[in-house]
A protein has these predicted regions:
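Acidic/polar low-complexity segments with low predicted structural confidence
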Residues: 1-138, 195, 289
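A short glycine/serine-rich beta->alpha loop
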Residues: 96-97, 148-153, 206-210
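Solvent-exposed alpha-helical segments within well-ordered globular domains of core cellular machineries
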Residues: 110, 114, 162, 201, ...
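Von Willebrand factor
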Residues: 112, 137-193, 196-238, 243, ...
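Conserved, well-folded catalytic cores of nucleic-acid-processing
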Residues: 115-118, 170, 206, 224, ...
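A generic local structural motif
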Residues: 128-131, 164, 222-224, 245-251
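VWA/integrin I-like adhesion module and closely mimicked acidic/polar interface patches used
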Residues: 241-286
Length: 289
């Protein structure tokens, strides 16, 4: 169902003439069917926001060959952008070792000497002398909600892709990514550990659609995060915070442990009000990078 929705969303395309508004476009794609990766890398270094915005348009190019080249590049580029300033990884349970009588799976390598000694004596090893291993509880779970209602241009797509890659870098296993309007597309479900590049590529296929039902989005996030055993569960809302359909979002938000609204810096008033009303935080976003 999600794949079908993404396929339908991705049918809209961007012409070369539309992309010519970007100064670097002619150098990156000097002719039909060409994508110069070296020129792209230079442009990305000089102006990350502008170049990521262009990348979001390239993956939806009318030029089929250019589109395929951009799609082969997109996921890797966005993930690399995130990794260059990557925070300490969290959210993956840490492998820990303990006495086997405290539970867990037997660690044969660490217990081998004890087992051999017991066999030599002709008796069974005691659990307290054996070593087991298990995973400690992850301390962070994230759910990223991407508002895809209305217009979904290059800059919004690029910002959403970077936000998703950053979330998956922070909590690689325990992150869900959902695109919503008056319905929802679950791009990555909680605990799926879906590859970040795959998620980014799916996000780049999104196009604007429908009205903005924040309450529905919050309920969807709560259902995803309920699957997690993490000690801290954060919902990230990438939106201007302006609900145009559905129930009162402030009521639905009470089911969320923690809410952070990622709002466009030039249109954050509603997002700030929403965050304030539910005890959340609002962070201004001025560009993809």
């Amino acid at each position: 169902e999600a794949e079908q929705a993404l396929a339908e969303a991705g049918r809209q395309s961007t012409s070369r003439r539309q992309m010519e508004q970007h100064e670097s476009f002619q150098e990156i794609s000097p002719e039909v069917g060409i994508l110069d990766e070296e020129a792209f890398a230079d442009a990305l270094r000089d102006d990350p926001d502008e170049t990521l915005t262009l990348l979001a348009e390239l993956v939806g190019a009318t030029d089929e060959k250019l589109r395929e080249l951009a799609r082969s590049l997109a996921g890797r580029v966005v993930v690399d952008v995130v990794r260059t300033g990557a925070p300490r990884r969290r959210g993956i349970g840490r492998l820990r070792h303990r006495r086997a009588d405290h539970g867990g799976e037997l660690d044969v390598d660490r217990s081998l000497e004890t087992i051999a000694a017991s066999r030599a004596r002709g008796d069974a090893p005691s659990l307290e002398d054996l070593t087991a291993r298990d995973w400690s509880k992850p301390n962070l779970a994230l759910c990223l909600l991407i508002d895809r209602s209305g217009s979904m241009g290059g800059e919004r797509l690029a910002t959403a892709a970077v936000a998703a890659a950053a979330s998956l870098w922070r909590a690689p296993i325990d992150t869900s990514v959902i695109a919503f309007s008056d319905d929802a597309i679950v791009i990555a479900s909680q605990g799926s550990g879906r590859d970040a590049e795959d998620v980014v590529n799916q996000i780049f296929r999104l196009r604007g659609h429908g009205t903005t039902d924040l309450a529905f989005a919050f309920r969807t996030a709560a259902a995803q995060l309920a699957r997690s055993s993490a000690t801290r569960k954060i919902t990230l809302l990438l939106s201007d915070g302006r609900a145009t359909a559905g129930d009162d979002p402030t009521i639905a938000a009470t089911d969320l442990d923690e809410l952070i609204v990622l709002a466009p810096a030039d249109d954050a008033e509603n997002a700030q009000s929403l965050a304030d009303s539910v005890g959340g935080r609002c962070v201004m976003v001025s560009g993809p990078a």
